[in-house]
Amino acid sequence: MDIKVPFGATEKQKAIYRRDANFIASLLLNKLKYPPNAVAGIMANIGVETGHTYDFKQKQSKGGPGRGLFQMEIGGMYDAYQGWMKANNKRDTALSQLEYMDAAVKGKDGSHPTDKGRAYLGTNIPRYLNKSLHDELNTVDKMTMDFRDKFEN
C-alpha cells in the first residue's frame, strides 16, 4: 500500500507515520476483516483526516473540535465514542477507534447520545455502508467516497 506522509516531515517522522499507517491497515484487514478495497478506502479517509500522520491522538488544527483517526467532533461523534468506550471498558487507542468505527458501520455501537441503545448513525446508513464496504466488487474510489459521505459526514 502506498502510504502518503506529510510534506516536509523528517525521515524519522516519515518512518513513524508509515509504521502507524501499516499497523492501522493491518488491524482493518486482519482483525476487523475488511476486504482490501475497503481498507484502502478507509485508509484514504484516515490519511486526509489526520494530515497523513495516522496518529490516533491527532487533534484538529487551530483548536478545532476534531479528534482521532476519524476527526470525531467534540459535541458529536467524539462524545458518543467516549460513551461507547466507557460502556465497553475500553481506553482510547487506535484499535478502540477502529472498533468503534466498525461497530458504528454495523449499527451495533449503541452510542446515540440522546436515544440510548440506538446506533449513532441510525439504521439506514449502517445497513448501506456495511454492505458497500464488504462488497469486494466495489472499487477503492467508491468505498472511499461511501465511507467519507456516510461515516465522516
Task: Locate predicted features.
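Peptidoglycan-targeting cell-wall enzymes and recognition modules
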Residues: 2-26, 30-31, 47-139
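Active-site or metal-binding loop neighborhoods of secreted/extracellular toxin and effector enzymes
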Residues: 131-153
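Short, well-structured alpha-helical segments
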Residues: 22-25, 39-46, 141-148
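GGW-centered surface loops in extracellular recognition modules
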Residues: 28, 36-37
